[in-house]
Design a protein with these regions (language model features):
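Catalytic grooves of carbohydrate-active enzymes
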Residues: 259-298
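Acidic-and-aromatic substrate-binding clefts and catalytic sites of carbohydrate-active enzymes
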Residues: 107, 115-116, 139-148, 211-218, ...
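An active-site-proximal "capping" alpha-helix that borders the catalytic cofactor pocket
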Residues: 184-201
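Active-site beta->alpha N-cap acidic-glycine motif
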Residues: 67-163, 168-174, 178-179, 196-200, ...
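N-terminal pre-catalytic segment of deacetylase/amide-hydrolase enzymes
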Residues: 2-119, 151, 282-283, 290-303
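His/Asp/Glu-enriched short active-site or ligand-binding loop at hydrolase and phosphoryl-transfer sites
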Residues: 217, 221-257, 292-301
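Charged helix-capping and loop-helix junction motifs
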Residues: 119, 247-251, 278-281
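Structural recognition of the beta-strand scaffold that forms the well-ordered cores
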Residues: 97-101, 135-139, 161-164, 208-212, ...
Length: 303
């Protein structure tokens, strides 16, 4: 197995994406962004994708809460017990697609929020509800602490499920677009701290899925999270919504990339992804016109 870092952007886009990913999360930018990261460690991804488990048994106490509607499906560990990686449904005949949204906020952005910067996007959540689009929100623990009422509202709405995007939005391997890096023990604790923040906010619909900040990971990162009993979730469609100014371009990029079983990465952060809500209003009706049904990640993993 290789221990090389999988990045979220093609090499040509790295310089442009650095600033976006440092403050926003994986998947922004060029149409090919994310291709290398999504591959993960080949053996871990390939093996885990062929074996699923219908239980999150063994998850730590701070992990997905009792009271969620049902136990969400998880993937079996990869070789040597590595955390499994999911990026697209194995069942690719059904025209299903999962829109996922990273609710990003780093551990040091509190002062910026206090000064009026908006890391939330209530209009986006409202639009998803109005359009009746089941969605998975990959939330940082720091975001849940900053916006506890919104975290609770999202996390008690059956239209949504909340997945873990770390507490701090620090990198789980280095280099990763300038993000501060956590070592193995700190990385594992960071995941638990995020689940605890969701619970503190009153979110119930939490699921044992994890998205690496910046989308960057390697074997060591997968090993560090193995005891958390989570499934790492990447994507196969990059929206390019981070710091985008043209919602039409974002929508076209998504529409061009979606295939049956796709996972689309977008963002739920006004300051870093200001046109996402408008793009969603274009994406949803067009995909429905093409015969697609929107589902949460848990449904894709369960197929």
């Amino acid at each position: 197995m290789t221990n090389s870092v999988r990045k979220v952007a093609a090499a040509a886009a790295t310089a442009v994406l650095g600033a976006a990913l440092a403050g926003c999360g994986g998947g922004a930018g060029a149409p090919d962004a994310g291709r290398e990261a999504r591959m993960g460690t080949p053996a871990a991804s390939a093996s885990a994708s062929t074996s699923t488990s219908a239980s999150a048994a063994g998850a730590p106490a701070a992990s997905p809460q009792a009271g969620a509607p049902a136990k969400p499906p998880t993937m079996a560990p990869g070789p040597n017990g590595l955390t499994p990686v999911f990026e697209r449904a194995k069942q690719r005949t059904d025209k299903t697609v999962a829109l996922t949204f990273d609710a990003d906020m780093t551990s040091d952005q509190g002062p910026r929020a206090a000064d009026g910067e908006h890391f939330d996007n209530p209009a986006l959540i409202s639009t998803l509800r109005t359009l009746k689009v089941p969605s998975t929100i990959f939330m940082t623990g720091r975001w849940a602490e900053e916006y506890p009422d919104q975290a609770k509202s999202i996390g008690t709405d059956p239209n949504f499920e909340i997945a873990n995007h770390s507490y701090s939005h620090h990198a789980f391997t280095s280099p990763c677009y300038g993000l501060p890096a956590l070592d193995g023990a700190a990385a594992r604790a960071d995941v638990d701290r995020a689940f605890a923040a969701f619970k503190q906010a009153g979110a119930v619909n939490t699921v044992p899925y994890f998205r690496f900040p910046g989308g960057c990971y390697d074997d060591q990162a997968l090993r560090a999270l193995s005891t958390a009993k989570v499934t790492a979730v990447q994507w196969d469609v990059v929206s390019g919504d981070a710091f985008a100014k043209d919602p039409v371009a974002v929508a076209e990029q998504v529409l061009d990339g979606v295939k049956p079983g796709s996972v689309v990465v977008m963002h739920c952060t006004r300051s870093a992804a200001p046109v996402t809500e408008e793009a969603v209003r274009r994406i949803v009706p067009e995909l429905r016109k093409r015969g697609y049904r929107f589902v949460k990640v848990s449904e894709l993993i369960g197929k």
